[in-house]
Amino acid sequence: MRESMRIELELQTDNFTVIPYNHQYYLASAIYNKIHSANPAYAKRLHNYQKFKFFTFSLLQIRKRVIRKEGIETIDGKAYLYISSPNNEFIENFVAGLLEDGKLRVGNVEFFVRKAKILPIPKKFNILKTISPIYLKTMIETEDGLKTYDLLPNNSKFYENLKNNLKKKYEAFYNEKCDMNFEFEVLKFRPKRMRIKNDIYCRCSEMVFKVWGDYDLIKFGYECGFGEKNSMGFGMVVNVEDKNQKNKKLKTKI
């Protein structure tokens, strides 16, 4: 299996452009469009694989911003996007599509790609922080039958599902049984209600959490995302090097 890769894109649009809060669907569409432009056969294969896609991406990270009712206003028009996958074929095709015109359209907003940078994979993990929220669900029995219930860290099922989900993705990607394990402790979390597309909403969690256990399994979560719906922009994390980060207020970019 090929080496993993994570990239940072520095994007530029007009000053004072307003970005919608729920822009994950637009980003997912933009990513697929770029891949399809570069390699239609790979894009079709990726789209048709129903179980796991093995990539994730962040929400747009807008550092100079004003929060408006209709969305986030970019003061200087600059935003950052992070994309990660355990398979370079995905990243290579996305970058190839991006190089065709150097643009990325997010809904009605057109960004120009100013810079693209490959980021190194950390040698160790301790504290992780989400840059797109983690989504998990379970099924519960009701009088009307089985219903989908979105999980947050205040439910013990959240912890079980997060670990099991990561191991299942690892087994599917490497086509081998995963005997590795990891544990985690949630240091801070903030519940979010996000619109996936149209009128479909979900409850998810922005988190800072401590991890320990088998490095390769944690690294795989870092590469392809923790939790479900990674390919829709959920579950991307960054490694927090500052050991005092857990005592700081959790700042949300979106």
Curated annotation (Swiss-Prot):
UniProt-listed Pfam families: Cas6_I-A (PF21350), Cas_Cas6_C (PF01881)
Annotated protein name in UniProt: CRISPR-associated endoribonuclease Cas6 1
Gene behind this protein: cas6a
EC number(s) from the headed UniProt entry: 3.1.-.-
EC category name: hydrolase
Protein task: CRISPR (clustered regularly interspaced short palindromic repeat) is an adaptive immune system that provides protection against mobile genetic elements (viruses, transposable elements and conjugative plasmids). CRISPR clusters contain sequences complementary to antecedent mobile elements and target invading nucleic acids. CRISPR clusters are transcribed and processed into CRISPR RNA (crRNA). This protein processes pre-crRNA into individual crRNA units.
GO biological process, one term: defense response to virus
Gene Ontology MF terms in the entry: endonuclease activity; RNA binding
Residues the UniProt record annotates as site (Transition state stabilizer): K53
Active-site residues annotated for this sequence: Y32 (proton acceptor), H47 (proton donor)
Family the entry assigns: Belongs to the CRISPR-associated protein Cas6/Cse3/CasE family.
Organism: Methanocaldococcus jannaschii (strain ATCC 43067 / DSM 2661 / JAL-1 / JCM 10045 / NBRC 100440) (Methanococcus jannaschii)
Keywords, comma-separated and alphabetical: Antiviral defense, Endonuclease, Hydrolase, Nuclease, RNA-binding
